[in-house]
Amino acid sequence: MAASSYVDGERDMEKGGMILLQSSENQNPMIDPSPTPSPSATATAPALVLSNSGKRMDQAGKKKYVKQVTGRHNDTELHLAAQRGDLAAVQQILKDINSQMEGILSGEEFDAEVAEIRASIVNEVNELGETALFTAADKGHLDVVKELLKYSSRESIAKKNRSGYDPLHIAAIQGHHAIVEVLLDHDATLSQTFGPSNATPLVSAAMRGHTEVVNQLLSKAGNLLEISRSNNKNALHLAARQGHVEVIKALLSKDPQLARRIDKKGQTALHMAVKGQSSEVVKLLLDADPAIVMQPDKSCNTALHVATRKKRAEIVELLLSLPDTNANTLTRDHKTALDIAEGLPLSEESSYIKECLARSGALRANELNQPRDELRSTVTQIKNDVHIQLEQTKRTNKNVHNISKELRKLHREGINNATNSVTVVAVLFATVAFAAIFTVPGGDNNDGSAVVVGRASFKIFFIFNALALFTSLAVVVVQITLVRGETKAEKRVVEVINKLMWLASMCTSVAFLASSYIVVGRKNEWAAELVTVVGGVIMAGVLGTMTYYVVKSKRTRSMRKKVKSARRSGSNSWHHSDFSNSEVDPIFAI
């Protein structure tokens, strides 16, 4: 019963099994389908290769597909036919789908089902993740590729195998330019694929010297020149390393500036070329851009250093013949090309390289007169000295700033002490002046008026005592209402208050002298006159002396300001100190 269910399903097991398409009416539901055909099965219907998933798929109870595979990597019959390049076998496998579906479905349902089965067969992958199209592109079977493209989906064409390559990329690697052309004509965006290490098809083809493939890719996607591998090596780097002359010509004709591009090590294509054996490649690169002959990499190696280290005698001779070549440039290790050559094992190539270098005037590093290095050392020393000076200046400015803060603090404390002292003195003046009006000289009458109210001395006493009182009170009011904090502003207020205190002192003195005439009486006026002379001389002397020094101090400050202004206008490198910033700040009062 089980054997009869696999109609014409048996094939040679060494070639592998196949998928059987059959009607569900002829299948015993109690028998588990197996991918291994029964030896007793009779062949009446062709087989279809559909899937290597190993699963049974039942659709609407009408049909069943059973997977059978063969080959090293679970290849289907379609894979094997594509690998052989057997176009007839490929066409037969795809054609058998129609014959097997006849009688089961019809009309649009038939066409849709056939298309679905055909797509499943064509897009099937083996254990390596390769479709039949990939296999045909890898082996270079153009006709098979064209046939499979008719039934391949966009995802299948761009599908990568486990190594990271798609059909276009593998065709470029193998140099199958006709297949590359067919695939690009089918879908030009396939050229934008990336393989391992971010390699494009152009990079892979250039590295292997497939000139026709390179030309095909450049004609369809010129932007591939701008895309490098993950190490920043582009197609020109890799082609130059392998010495592919025609590929170099094709790439440079597309973009001559490509010769200047560097990889992560700072190497140009010339650095890569001198590692190889082709002098012609070196000539092509130098013709495209002669300046790159002295372009160093990140280790300061020029092409001459690299060629010497690789013992490329012919290339060394070519480089030394160029007028731009300097045979005495130093690497980061402070070595010239001659130092490198002398460090090579003794051989015919190393001896010839040393001869070429000697003829070109090459010297050892310790023999060089190195003014540039000395200049660099001097400049470095100057930079260090300037840096030290700047640091010292910075520290000095910081110290000056701190000293300035301390001076402002001391100055503010001095002003506060002065204002406090002035306040105390002003209060004393006001107290004396206020008390004097109630204890007038000569006593009072019964009605409270002064006994000597009619005398001129009493009137002088009364007026100047009042002036002393109100002046002192004004000073007290200013002192208790002033908002402190601005040194210069407080200083100006103190100057004004000092003048008021002078006035209060003078008024108090006059009031005292006037009251002395009242107290001593007319018989002893000589005593009052003596007190007047003594007091007047003392007060006049003190006030006159203070006035002189105040005026002199103001003149001195004015001269200093002029000198500072002249210095500031002559040099823009100095700025106003924080201490002077408070000079223009206003006075704020409650």
UniProtKB/Swiss-Prot annotation:
PROSITE patterns: ANK_REP_REGION, ANK_REPEAT. The lineage of its organism: Eukaryota, Viridiplantae, Streptophyta, Embryophyta, Tracheophyta. It is found in: Cell membrane. It is a multi-pass membrane protein. This is Ankyrin repeat-containing protein ITN1. One of its GO terms (cellular component) is nucleus. Coiled coil: none annotated. The chain crosses the membrane at residues 422-442, 460-480, 500-520, 531-551. Interacts with REM19/RTV1. Keywords: ANK repeat, Cell membrane, Membrane, Repeat, Stress response, Transmembrane, Transmembrane helix. It comes from Arabidopsis thaliana (Mouse-ear cress). Disruption phenotype: No visible phenotype under normal growth conditions, but mutant seedlings show increased salt-stress tolerance. Its main location: membrane. GO terms for biological process: response to salt stress. Involved in salt stress tolerance. May act through abscisic acid (ABA) signaling pathways and promote reactive oxygen species (ROS) production. Expressed in roots, shoots, leaf vasculature and stems. ANK repeats lie at residues 73-102, 128-157, 163-192, 197-226, 231-260, 265-294, 299-329. Induction: By salt and drought stresses.
